[in-house]
Amino acid sequence: MHKIMAINAGSSSLKFQIFTMPGEEVLVKGLIERIGLPDAIFNMSFQNEKIKEIRAINNHGEAVEILLEQLKAHQVINDLSEITGVGHRVAHGGEDFVTSCVVTDEVVKGIEAVTNLAPLHNPANIIGIKTFRELLPNAVSVAVFDTAFHQTIPEENFLYALPYELYEKHHIRKYGFHGTSHKYVAGKAAEVLEKPLEKLKIISCHLGNGASVCAIEAGKSVNTSMGFTPNAGLMMGTRSGTIDATIIPYLVDELGYSLDEVMHMMSSESGVLGVSGISSDFRDIEIAAKEGNSRALLTLRMFTGQICNYIGAYASAMNGCDALLFTAGVGENSPLIRQMVTEQLSYLGVTCHVTKNNAGDMIISNDDEAVKVCIIPTNEELMIARDVEKYAKQTIS
């Protein structure tokens, strides 16, 4: 038995879990939020204990140091050498990283080379990788790429209708994201439905503050809604999703915005927040909608309508759908969103059992329907730990 740590570093946060492997038991988990601020929050839970501290944490490097200190101070581990592997979620791997890999100096350079494609995420991922390699030099470090699962998408689905040379020379194409989550829930759904993954046509809806839909055939991604960056596809918490590209020069040339202002608007002021004018959080939108707020209702109709557009297109492309999956914060916890989506898909044979949906059952479709509608809680950290386990076993055997 050995210990594997899974790390998910965001732009101002660091999510962590330690698993004992190969049993996949969670030893400790937690979240460090508001990194860079004087009132950063350190949360950690283990063995029925919960720790919450508010303190200054200036950067991700300091966050890692504090985390390792706390693990020892609370005797979650006695020595850092007990951690044999650390897995890092990396948002964007470009075309060079088609699977998880052991981190080397060359791998770090490769991740840095595509930082401009995920400027909010990759820099934090890199800092986490470098700090853990420095503080845990004997643990194997593994990079797990959000884009890797989508490397099976065929060329006709990942190319943009731009001059082909832009792909050949500059690798401008659809990459897709949330791959670790989509891969996990597809495998879990196969277990729940007691069917071989290789024989299933699955449409996975990862719906959180970031959101994407993925078509999965025989366990492989064949299309997904996000694109060159995580801004494409569905409208999201603060992201616009896909828009007519000529809106951008119009905003610059006719309305006087700078390009930086437009990009900030599209990534931080649009989506659910921009349309509703209320919040980027769907919980707030649902409350406002129930109170009759017209823009909150409009936001819900837009969001669920866009989801259904992708589901319909992917079901058509795969010539069917065996399972429709809802996962992530909104997908797992919003009966209203699930109901609004499934109500628009009756032509596919999709149903939603009201009682099962409201109770959050794992299978919420009617029993006799061919298309199984499932709520599958995602577990990206476990997927990361499993990938690390493959490499860590080689070093400790």
From Swiss-Prot:
Cofactor section: Mg(2+); Mn(2+)
Compartments, record wording: Cytoplasm
GO terms assigned for molecular function: acetate kinase activity; ATP binding; magnesium ion binding
GO CC, any one term: cytoplasm
Annotated keywords: ATP-binding, Cytoplasm, Kinase, Magnesium, Metal-binding, Nucleotide-binding, Transferase
Entry EC no(s): 2.7.2.1
SUPFAM superfamilies hit by this protein: Actin-like ATPase domain
Principal location class: cytoplasm
Gene3D superfamilies attached to this UniProt entry: 3.30.420.40
Known catalytic reactions: acetate + ATP = acetyl phosphate + ADP
Binding site for substrate: 89
Active site per UniProt: 146 (proton donor/acceptor)
Enzyme class: transferase
Entry binding sites for Mg(2+): 8, 380
Binding site for ATP: 15, 206-210, 281-283, 329-333
Site positions per UniProt: Transition state stabilizer: 178, 239
Cofactor note: Mg(2+). Can also accept Mn(2+).
InterPro entries cross-referenced by the UniProt entry: Ac/propionate_kinase, Aliphatic_acid_kin_short-chain, Aliphatic_acid_kinase_CS, ATPase_NBD
Pathway(s) where this gene product acts: Metabolic intermediate biosynthesis; acetyl-CoA biosynthesis; acetyl-CoA from acetate: step 1/2
Stated role: Catalyzes the formation of acetyl phosphate from acetate and ATP. Can also catalyze the reverse reaction.
Record-linked HAMAP family: Acetate_kinase
Subunit composition and interactions: Homodimer.
Family classification: Belongs to the acetokinase family.
Protein name as catalogued: Acetate kinase 1
Gene from which this protein is expressed: ackA1
